[in-house]
UniProtKB/Swiss-Prot annotation:
Entry GO MF terms: bacteriochlorophyll binding; electron transporter, transferring electrons within the cyclic electron transport pathway of photosynthesis activity; metal ion binding
Protein name: Light-harvesting protein B-800-850 beta chain D
Primary localization: membrane
Cellular component aspect of the GO annotation: plasma membrane; plasma membrane light-harvesting complex
Physiological role: Antenna complexes are light-harvesting systems, which transfer the excitation energy to the reaction centers.
The organism's place on the tree of life at top rank: Bacteria
Gene Ontology biological process terms in this record: photosynthesis, light reaction
Transmembrane segments: 24-46
Organism of derivation: Rhodopseudomonas palustris (strain ATCC BAA-98 / CGA009)
Entry keywords, A to Z: Antenna complex, Bacteriochlorophyll, Cell inner membrane, Cell membrane, Chlorophyll, Chromophore, Light-harvesting polypeptide, Magnesium, Membrane, Metal-binding, Transmembrane, Transmembrane helix
Protein encoded by which gene: pucBD
Length: 51
C-alpha cells in the first residue's frame, strides 16, 4: 500500500473512491437528520405532556 502513490494511507482507497464514499456518508447523514426532524416534530405534536 505504501508503494502505490494512488492509494491514501491508512484506508488504501484512492482519492476518487474516498470522495465517493464520503458523498454516500453525507447523503445518509442528511436522510437521517431529515427523519429525525420529522420524528421530533411528530413527537411534539402528539405528546400532550410536551405542550
Amino acid at each position: 500500500m505504501v508503494d502505490d502513490p494512488n492509494k491514501v494511507w491508512p484506508t488504501g482507497l484512492t482519492i476518487a473512491e474516498s470522495e465517493e464514499l464520503h458523498k454516500h456518508v453525507i447523503d445518509g447523514s442528511r436522510i437521517f437528520v431529515a427523519i429525525a426532524i420529522v420524528a421530533h416534530f411528530l413527537a411534539y405534536v402528539y405528546s400532550p405532556w410536551l405542550h
